[in-house]
Structure formats: structure tokens, C-alpha cells
């Protein structure tokens, strides 16, 4: 007998306590001369109703170019899961406006290596996780989005001196070969300081 279940209706618990068990009702009728008859209904198995997994997925690690971030699903649980083991699938997504997100090709593992170039700098990154419980029920979770920070990249190339290096001549610092991937508009700003040395080792600024 189910404790206190003695009325004509019964509210099946919304947790998993009776899922997959069998339920029946015993009814005893009493007539006007106190004759009693006991009847049992046909038993029926209590079916599961899909419960959404709870809690959230969190992105851990520095969200910056060149870094590797991880989808932390340790807090996600599902009462439908009999063995306590959820299966997760992952899809990393990016957005330019933090509103419309697109899947990143082949980014389907629990970790994601943010490119070390500028392709995702200032864009927004999130991960979509789908959990599947032992009964086949699925829940989709989205992490909070994070803006990808820039990491300072050194300018590449060399400065060269052009012109004849002789007394009375004018020489020029040629910086045309210097580039920097951090520079969005392609225009670098340069400052200059000419220096001289007597031994080609110790140099001093020229006033």
C-alpha cells in the first residue's frame, strides 16, 4: 500500500519515485447490509515524463586570442538519468553583435582553442551543450557569451636606413616593411630617435 493514498484520486509524484513501477487501485465496496466486495484494477506501468536537465554550462579559462577555453558541465544534472551519467555534445558559436550566433566549423569538443590571429578578437564566444540522459531525453543549454580579448602581438618586419650614409647627406628610416596584425586599419604610427656610437656597441641618442 501507498501511505495515505486512500481517496478516489491519486497524484503520482512528479519525481522519479514511481517511474517504471506498476500502479493499481484496490476498491472495497460495502452494501447496505454491510456486505463487502474487494476489487483490484488492472495494473499500469508509470511512464516517465521528460524532465529538463538543471543548472548551467560555464566557460572557463581566459577568453582571449590564442587561449584554450573549456565548457564546464559539472553542475548539470538530470533526475531522469538512472545511472547518473549524462552524455554531452558540444558546439562552439561566435557572433559579431552578441545577438546572432553562428556555429564555428569543427568546434565540437568540450574545449576550444581560440585562434591566435585576429579572426575572433572583439567577437563574442559561447558554447551550446546538449545533454542526453539514459532515457534518451535531451536538454539544450547555452553558456553566457564572452567577448574575445586581444593579446598584444609584436610588429614584424625591419626598419632600414636608405640613402648614402656620409657627411652632409640626408638619410631616411624606411618602415614600409613593418606590419602589425593588431592594427585594424592597417595604419601604424611611428616615432623616431636617431642614435650614434663610437664603437658600434654602446649607442646614445642624438639630441
Feature map (PLM): residue ranges:
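Ser/Thr/Pro/Gly-rich low-complexity disordered regions
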Residues: 1-207
Amino acid at each position: 500500500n501507498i501511505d495515505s493514498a486512500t481517496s478516489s484520486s491519486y497524484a503520482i509524484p512528479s519525481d522519479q519515485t514511481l517511474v517504471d513501477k506498476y500502479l493499481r487501485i484496490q476498491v472495497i465496496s460495502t452494501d447496505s447490509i454491510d456486505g463487502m466486495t474487494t476489487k483490484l484494477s488492472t495494473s499500469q506501468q508509470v511512464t516517465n515524463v521528460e524532465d529538463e536537465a538543471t543548472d548551467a554550462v560555464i566557460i572557463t579559462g581566459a577568453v582571449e586570442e590564442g587561449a584554450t577555453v573549456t565548457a564546464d558541465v559539472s553542475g548539470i544534472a538530470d533526475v531522469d538519468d538512472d545511472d547518473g551519467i549524462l552524455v554531452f555534445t558540444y558546439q562552439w558559436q561566435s557572433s559579431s553583435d552578441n545577438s546572432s550566433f553562428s556555429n564555428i566549423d569543427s568546434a565540437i569538443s568540450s574545449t576550444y582553442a581560440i585562434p591566435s590571429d585576429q579572426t575572433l578578437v572583439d567577437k563574442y564566444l559561447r558554447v551550446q551543450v546538449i545533454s542526453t540522459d539514459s532515457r534518451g531525453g535531451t536538454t539544450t543549454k547555452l553558456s553566457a557569451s564572452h567577448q574575445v580579448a586581444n593579446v598584444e602581438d609584436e610588429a614584424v618586419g625591419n626598419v632600414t636606413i636608405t640613402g648614402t650614409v656620409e657627411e652632409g647627406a640626408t638619410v631616411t628610416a624606411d618602415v614600409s616593411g613593418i606590419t602589425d596584425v593588431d592594427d585594424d586599419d592597417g595604419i601604424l604610427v611611428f616615432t623616431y630617435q636617431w642614435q650614434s656610437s663610437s664603437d658600434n656597441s654602446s649607442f646614445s641618442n642624438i639630441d
